[in-house]
Amino acid sequence: MTPQCRTYLQQFETYMQSERQLSAHTVRNYMYELQRGSELLPEGVDLLNVGREHWQQVLAKLHRKGLSPRSLSLWLSAIKQWGEFLLRSGVIELNPAKGLSAPKQAKPLPKNIDVDSISHLLAIEGNDPLTLRDKAIMELFYSSGLRLAELAALDLSSVQYDQHEVRVLGKGNKERIVPVGRYAIEAISAWLKCRKQISCEDNALFVTEKGKRLSHRSIQARMSKWGQEQALSMRVHPHKLRHSFATHMLESSADLRAVQELLGHENLSTTQIYTSLDFQHLAKVYDNAHPRAKKQQDK
């Protein structure tokens, strides 16, 4: 590193501390990331004459080394701040790091509830209206994989009991018909007997004790309550049941297109987040399905 480059680095450190008033931890990280980047530059290129193509090459090298998106973002922040500093100082006319971006951080997969825990959750007992209503709601979420907004918007006419179907108005006002399982139909029927005794303002399928359409927040709160009462190890909410529906369907059928239609996803890529099945399940499917994978029976 040239003496001139070291001088500017010292000035940059002072600028970060004094003018930008960044924490000592952040300044230390930025200086480390600049040093890391400079060591990967081609011979004859330093932090003062680096070009965009050089930073792109360094970014690729760091990515190949296995740096996480979070670490790459920190490195990019450092070289962008360095470029802005040199720009302000009149050393360069364009920031070579401007516009560079790190690979997107992978979104953590939502955790589904296993089948046994779902069964335990849905085994709530009681014949009072609220319990019957809540059981019908949870059965329908798990049976058909509805979104919270879709379920809350259901009317009495939305469910076709003879056909075991529900007509749903999804995102973008797109209508779809989704199958409803026997347990959900039975739970809804039990709830409707109680609903008849409530003076309702509209035709909402799920209503409060005062006859008003049940709000999103109320549905979320009731499901959280039942998760706690049934002593589940994780928090229960509508999307958790939707995710569990999708995961369990794919584990049983592996029909991605069918699950896409059931969930109302416009793009298949959205449905694919549910395909991260555990290896034990995949290995079992492979052993059962592949003609040359079946293990010999013990003799």
UniProtKB/Swiss-Prot annotation:
Keywords: Cell cycle, Cell division, Chromosome partition, Cytoplasm, DNA integration, DNA recombination, DNA-binding. It comes from the Bacteria. It is found in: Cytoplasm. GO terms for biological process: cell division; chromosome segregation; DNA transposition. InterPro entries: CB (IPR044068), DNA_brk_join_enz (IPR011010), Integrase-like_cat_sf (IPR013762), Integrase_catalytic (IPR002104), Integrase_recombinase_N (IPR010998), Integrase_SAM-like_N (IPR004107), Recomb_XerC (IPR011931), Tyrosine_recombinase_XerC/XerD (IPR023009). GO terms for molecular function: DNA binding; tyrosine-based site-specific recombinase activity. The active site is at R147, K171, H239, R242, H265, Y274 (o-(3'-phospho-dna)-tyrosine intermediate). GO terms for cellular component: cytoplasm. Residues 3-87 form the Core-binding (CB) domain. Forms a cyclic heterotetrameric complex composed of two molecules of XerC and two molecules of XerD. Belongs to the 'phage' integrase family. XerC subfamily. HAMAP family: Recomb_XerC_XerD. Site-specific tyrosine recombinase, which acts by catalyzing the cutting and rejoining of the recombining DNA molecules. The XerC-XerD complex is essential to convert dimers of the bacterial chromosome into monomers to permit their segregation at cell division. It also contributes to the segregational stability of plasmids. This is Tyrosine recombinase XerC. The lineage of its organism: Bacteria, Pseudomonadati, Pseudomonadota, Gammaproteobacteria, Alteromonadales. The gene is xerC.
